[in-house]
């Protein structure tokens, strides 16, 4: 059941189970809508082949609803349930909800904040896709969310794709893997936090392949990457991502303010795009002669970078081979 208040532009949903997502439908065939005079009429589903009143009501909800309140008892927000609600700025999700379906809130471009209750176990692909003003996604403490994508190695599967205003993202502790496209289009990210069980990109984790393709975590505003202290796979050193043994540099944030970075002693290798697109970076000091660099795109589009290296070092050979500016240090 649902009803809509035209004065407050609020859609209230009650019942048990899920919401109906057939075509543009969001609830069930017994849905009702308040008229201005307080009476109700049955509009069936949101399908465009319904009555004239039904079509008008569907259009009104999609274009004018500003607030959605889902009452306790609803367990699933079905696929595309509220997609393209043009005026939606706020949605309240109760602790009874366990699943948010694919594209559930896609293209809700006025939505700015959302809180995911701890009860949610799965968030489908594209759930918040193209919510271009969504700057805050908060997972309640003790989140049970363990799945956030349906097709982990395909573009378009991320629930937050093209959330261009998203500033921070804290991965729920139960998430182990994401696809390499997960942060695609999240151009305003300043901080990312990974939970205690997070390992890396699905299908690429292993020996030294974790985060070897960071194609989507390329926000030029990203200043720091955080990792839960109890995570056995990853480590954050001053906001820079390493493996737990601190021997492999995985990702240097693109928006880091400092123009100089000294690679810690003990670092044995770097991922294939660890410094890619770090155009603020001017100086990288590598004093370890034995450190081996293999990937040409490691410093791709680092337009101002100079490597400070030891003579007769592996890194010196790499700089020469890849035509990267370098200076010899004692």
Regions found by a protein language model. Give the residues of each.
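Acidic, glycine/polar-enriched metal-coordinating patches/loops
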Residues: 299, 322
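Structural signature of tandem-repeat unit edges
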Residues: 8-17, 63-76, 86-99, 109-122, ...
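Surface-exposed intrinsically disordered loops and tails
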Residues: 27-57
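Leucine-rich repeat
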Residues: 50-60, 158-160, 214-216
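Extracellular leucine-rich repeat
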Residues: 46-48, 81, 100, 123
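Extracellular, modular beta-sheet/disulfide-rich ectodomains of secreted and cell-surface proteins
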Residues: 1-9, 15-29
